[in-house]
Amino acid sequence: MKNSKTSNKWMYLICFLFCQITWSQTVFGKWKTIDDRKGSTKAIIEIYKEDGLMHAKVVEILEEGKKGALCTKCEGERKNKPILGMKIMEDFEKNNKGIYKGDKLFDPEQAMTFKGRDWLDDDNKNRLKVRGYLAFLYRTQTWHRVLEN
């Protein structure tokens, strides 16, 4: 009987820890971007926290023939700079609904900055919804979490 109680305690502990890990998913980490028009993989983006705000940068380019791409359409300090290492999100704040919002979501292909929102998919916490706004128009991409081995 004693072994049965001990086994039950271990099962409860394992279930509790599993639930904690599952529920504690955050937006922070590495994400694979998928072109929502073509369906092709484009890059790995690292989302990180700096000074209490969310930021993101390109850490790997996956798209064929674009590994050393420069931001040729960009202006100012980004003009002709490598896309690899470029910050694409700056100063996003989390609201009370778990959505990160900011005014600096940069698309190096279009060389444009948008207002943006990011949130974890309710159905799959390994998917991140990234939405860029230009006035009342918007476009949403789904990024996939890079699972570390």
Task: Label each residue range with its predicted role.
Residues 1-26:
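Bacterial Sec-dependent N-terminal signal peptides
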Residues 129-139:
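Short, exposed beta-strand-loop hairpins at the edges of beta-sheets
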Residues 25-30, 96-103, 125-129:
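Short, hydrophobic/aromatic-rich segments at coil-to-beta transitions
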Residues 35, 40-106, 113-114:
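Central antiparallel beta-sheet cores of small beta-barrel/beta-sandwich binding domains
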Residues 38-40, 111-113, 123, 136-138:
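A cross-taxa feature marking solvent-exposed loop/turn segments within ectodomains of secreted
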Residues 26-40, 141-147:
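K/E-rich alpha-helical interaction surfaces of small helical-bundle regulatory domains
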Residues 48, 93, 119-122, 144:
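Well-ordered beta-strand positions
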Residues 103-125, 130:
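Acidic, glycine-rich flexible loop segments
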